[in-house]
């Protein structure tokens, strides 16, 4: 640290762009959504441990899924609204890594919300529901890593602490390995896997939506992390922007 002498009578304020009503609520609302997905993750993990189907806990999960997704939606909308009238932030959406970090859990949460309704009412998509529940929280932790570690170049980068990034990355990998390892062990043991449905139906539409949202999430993930992988392999430096997305 450098000593300032004489000490100023008043400290320097925040960057004027950050002194905004939208920024008071934008980050907390996002993290409330992330934390809400932790409850769904815990419920699904408990069901896997005790060999219960997703349908048995679907009613209990529904409120938490809706709660998490709504808070995440409001947080993203507030951030986009703020970026729109602040010069230099790329309009409503810039496809910045930090923006994508909140978009991926939002997409998975939307898929989980629809899949959960089908599981609760018709007993279908039990595996989809469990998988999306685990992925939504895993990507929430990954999103926190993107924001707080400074691993990816971003106009939203608020910290460059490698230690914090390593801890978050370790949490992400531990949760992912344990949860999805248990999911793989339980796969095929649930009777819901034998439930049939007409493809041209509401369930068929939900299945198509699940596939599209999964593709959107994977595409966003690749576009976000490919530059970091490219640089880590010493292949040079590239930038993936809005034309890709």
Place the predicted regions along the sequence by residue:
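Polytopic transmembrane helical bundles with strong interfacial aromatic enrichment
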Residues: 1-245
